[in-house]
């Protein structure tokens, strides 16, 4: 079914969550949503790779992004240091960078299906409304033990990966290189648990090769209004992407990168109905100017409403 209005979207969400998956009865998992204005594809050697149920974090949408992960972080910080003055941790910094669309290992989602619908209808920054492609709301479930605190060791470790060269991270090898990562982390967080015992270090080597969900600090208006939750993507040797499937088959496979996190279904939005749905969402208190409260974004959102030739 291709949704044509907000009611269609809510009906589909109700069917998926409560009729098919009995979400209110299963206390072992949580459900959330990710809205995409089109089907984002991975790029390898100039070719699009099939996604099936998988979806990449922004950093994995282009080969060059992975190669220059450290540059992205350093340049974003150098060019706009004032924006990060209130951030006390790397997790908070990367969350803010994700907000401003800097490619990171974080992938944002929401517990609010209407907010996901806004993003699926192209409600991003800078007036970028995509009316040519169908939108998608990915319905995702995660085991509660795979949802971490923003202060947990594994989330902190993944957040510090941009500071370490690719060649120095090899979690599957004896010379795993995690001492480089530990050095960067302890600069910001003395007493990081990786130093506690070889067993904890071994566990981190395993965990860093998975995707994890975590609930971030609400340090931006977007994250607060979005009811945001993040997926944090770890890495393989040489910081190669994980390519998680997010399939139901891998949901219970501890060796799978997406263990404990799966896409259960996709709600599809008809491309030529996006404008109507955005207008309907405004009556439910969901609009871009609430999520992106910068004056430039607010201006770009409200100006077309009062233009005579806007039809």
Spell out what each predicted region is:
Residues 1-311:
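Catalytic-core elements of nucleic-acid end-processing and repair enzymes
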């Amino acid at each position: 079914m291709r949704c044509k209005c907000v009611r269609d979207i809510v009906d589909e969400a109700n069917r998926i969550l409560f009729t098919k998956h009995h979400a209110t009865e299963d206390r072992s998992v949580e459900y959330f949503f990710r809205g995409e204005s089109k089907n984002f594809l991975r790029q390898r050697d100039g070719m699009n790779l099939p996604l099936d149920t998988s979806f990449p974090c922004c950093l994995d949408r282009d080969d060059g992004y992975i190669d220059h992960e450290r540059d992205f972080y350093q340049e974003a910080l150098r060019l706009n240091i004032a924006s990060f003055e209130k951030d006390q941790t790397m997790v908070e910094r990367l969350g803010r960078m994700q907000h401003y669309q800097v490619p990171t290992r974080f992938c944002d989602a929401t517990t609010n299906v209407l907010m996901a619908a806004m993003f699926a209808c192209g409600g991003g920054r800078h007036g970028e409304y995509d009316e040519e492609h169908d939108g998608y709301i990915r319905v995702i479930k995660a085991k509660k033990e795979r949802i971490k605190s923003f202060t947990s060791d594994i989330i902190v470790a993944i957040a510090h990966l941009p500071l370490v060269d690719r060649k120095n991270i090899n979690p599957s090898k004896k010379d795993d290189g995690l001492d480089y990562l530990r050095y960067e982390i302890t600069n910001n967080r003395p007493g990081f648990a990786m130093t506690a015992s070889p067993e904890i270090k071994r566990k981190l080597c395993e965990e860093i090769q998975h995707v994890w969900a975590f609930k971030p600090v609400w340090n931006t208006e977007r994250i607060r209004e979005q009811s945001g939750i993040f997926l944090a993507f770890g890495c393989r040797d040489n910081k190669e992407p994980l390519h998680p499937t997010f399939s139901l088959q891998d949901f219970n496979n501890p060796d799978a990168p997406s263990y404990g996190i799966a896409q259960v279904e996709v709600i599809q939005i008809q491309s030529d109905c996006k404008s109507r749905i955005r207008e309907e969402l405004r009556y439910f208190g969901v609009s871009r100017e609430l999520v992106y409260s910068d004056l430039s974004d607010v201006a770009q959102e409200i100006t077309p409403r009062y233009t005579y030739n806007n039809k």
